């Protein structure tokens, strides 16, 4: 187990309300998060599990309801890492060239390493990938 693996914080149930107005390392803020039964589509019209809008360093997430705990956790890791990577002009070198598959792989790795997404684990995620500050 590496140093990052020692910080595994696993919550039994993910309460999305704990992420509202959450300040993350790197100066990012999750201003809102909601679950929806409405269809979500990505920028090119494909069905999506989630959609994140980033205005500067503020994120608003909409996630399809009905996901199981693991799917919700991986989705949170994926959306936050991707949003952080595109929200700033010069993201860390380790994520600069990430594509959708890379974000998904990183999200699965984060879930395997730290367990269910939580405020502390999302901060570990952004720190691990090189986002620093606030």
Walk through the language-model features, giving the residues of each.
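Metalloprotease/metallohydrolase-associated module, dominated by Zn2+-dependent proteases
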Residues: 2-71, 87-134
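Active-site recognition of the HExxH zinc-binding catalytic motif
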Residues: 74-86
């Amino acid at each position: 187990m590496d140093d990052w693996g020692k910080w595994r914080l696993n919550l039994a149930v993910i309460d999305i309300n704990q992420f509202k107005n959450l300040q993350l390392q790197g100066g990012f803020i999750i201003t809102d998060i909601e679950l929806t039964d409405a269809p979500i589509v990505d920028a090119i019209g494909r069905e999506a599990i989630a959609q994140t809008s980033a205005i500067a360093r503020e994120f608003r997430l909409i996630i399809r309801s009905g996901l199981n705990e693991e799917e919700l956790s991986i989705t949170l890791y994926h959306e936050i890492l991707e949003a952080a990577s595109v929200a700033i002009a010069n993201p860390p070198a380790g994520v600069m060239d990430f594509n959708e598959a890379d974000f998904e792989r990183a999200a699965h790795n984060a879930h395997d390493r730290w367990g269910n997404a939580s405020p502390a684990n999302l901060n570990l995620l952004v720190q691990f990938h090189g986002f620093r500050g606030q």
